[in-house]
Amino acid sequence: MESETVLYSADFCCDDPFLRRGEIFSDITFYPYPGGLFTYIEKYCKIKKDFNCIYNYVYTCLQYRGDYMSELLRVENLHVAVGGKTLLHGINLTVNTGEVHVIMGVNGAGKSTLLHAIMGNPAYEITEGHVYFEGEDITELSTDKRARLGIFLSFQNPVSIAGITTENFIRTAKTTISGKQQRLFPFKRLLKSRMEGLAMDPSCGDRYLNDGFSGGERKKSEILQMRILEPKLAMLDETDSGLDVDAVRIVSRNISEFHNENNSLLLITHLNQI
C-alpha cells in the first residue's frame, strides 16, 4: 500500500470579484484525520458577511490507487432556478472517484440547491449548464434514473412515508438499483448488521419509513440506506445537524466505513468533526 497523499483545493461561487483562490487557501489549515479519510479544517477563511459564498473543500486519499483518479461527476456552468428565481449562477465542480468534497457556506448560499439539482429534483430547474456522471450527460435524466446510475442524496429534513416499512423500502430500492432480487434472509442479516453499527433500535426496520422517528433516527435512517445501497456518489445534506455528540460520532464512523477508492462523497456540513 502506498503512503497517504493529501490533495486539497477550494472553489467558490459568488459575485465578489475581490475574493480569490489564494485568499481562501491562506486562512485554511488541512490535517489528515486518523484513518486517512477525512480532513479537519482548522478555521474558515474570513469573508464579507454580505456575500453569499459556497466553498468546496476537497480531500483526496490516494493510499489505494496511487495518483490515478477517474472523473465521476462534472458540473459545468450550472444555473439553477426555483420558482422562477435563479439561485445558482455558473457553478463548476468536478468530483473524481475516491474523493471526499466538503461544501461549506452561509445559510442561503445555495448548497442544498446544488445537491438537489445534481439529483434531478424537478423543483430545481436547470436553466443553463450540464451535469455529467461517468462521462454521460444526465442533465435531462429523471431522479429515479440518476439513482439507478448510483447517485444518492441524504436529505437535510428526511420525510416520512407511511405504508411501507423501512426494511421493505430499502430492500425494494436495492433490488431496483442493483437489478438483482434481494433474498429475504441474507438481506435481513445485512440490515440487522448495519442497524447495529448505527446503534438503531431494531424495531425501526419494521416501522414505516421515518414515521414517528426522532430527528436522530431519521438521520441514521438515511445513513442506513447509504450503507446498504452502496452508491457510487453519496451526497449528504447536513446529516450531522440536530445530532448529539454520540450520534455524530456514530454517523461519522459509518461515513468513514462507507467511503473507499471506488466511491465518492459530497458533504454539506457546518461541523469540522464530521
Where are the language model's segments positioned?
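H-loop/switch region of ABC-family ATPase nucleotide-binding domains
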Residues: 268-270
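Q-loop/switch helix immediately C-terminal to the Walker
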Residues: 157, 163-177, 190
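The feature captures the beta-strand-to-loop junction immediately N-terminal to the Walker
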Residues: 104-106
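ABC ATPase C-loop
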Residues: 226-227
